[in-house]
Amino acid sequence: VELVLRTATDDEMLQMLGSNQIDLAYTLDKPLLQPSFVLAVDEPEPICVVAPAGHPLAEQAEVTLQELAGQEFLLTERGMSYRDALDQCMAAQGLAIKPFLELGSASLLCQMVEHGMGLSFLPEYIVQNALAAGTLSRLNVPACCVEMRRQLFYHRDKWLTPQMKAFITLVQR
């Protein structure tokens, strides 16, 4: 059994899936509908504004976009689905966040926020352990409630090996 993980845009992943370069495609984005693919997993994934424990904004019942605009942010790169959603929320109010750091690794961003380096906007599955441990606080930002979809696809004509079926079952949990 060989497991190779690749990162790519949704379009690139679906093209690779369609040309049989990959067996499965896992996305975190807006809902995707592809008639030539089987949708094996389709789950909601909340995206959260998080701050280090003890941050002044964490004490507030609600945080406005104007308050966020004045904060130091560590974000994923432009073009990432949830980063784009944050930028759109801000732009709708005539605001923008200019992050002092952009990284491709959401896990590393989470760790940096835990160490007090700024705020971030990350999927709940990335931050859930830190929230439970009390090292991060989730900010309540009513003007920017974002939910993406975790989706796993395979080609409709693809024969699924036992290992692929086991992986799909693992992701479904």
Q: What does each model-identified segment do?
A:
Residues V1-Q34, L103:
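Central regulatory/effector-binding core of bacterial HTH transcription factors
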Residues Y26-S36, D84, Q88, A92, ...:
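A ligand-binding cleft/hinge motif common to bilobed small-molecule-binding domains
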Residues L28, L57, E72-Q93, L160-M164, ...:
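Secondary-structure junction motif
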Residues S36-F73, P162:
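Flexible hinge/capping segments at coil-to-helix
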Residues F37-C48, A133-V146:
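Short beta-strand->loop
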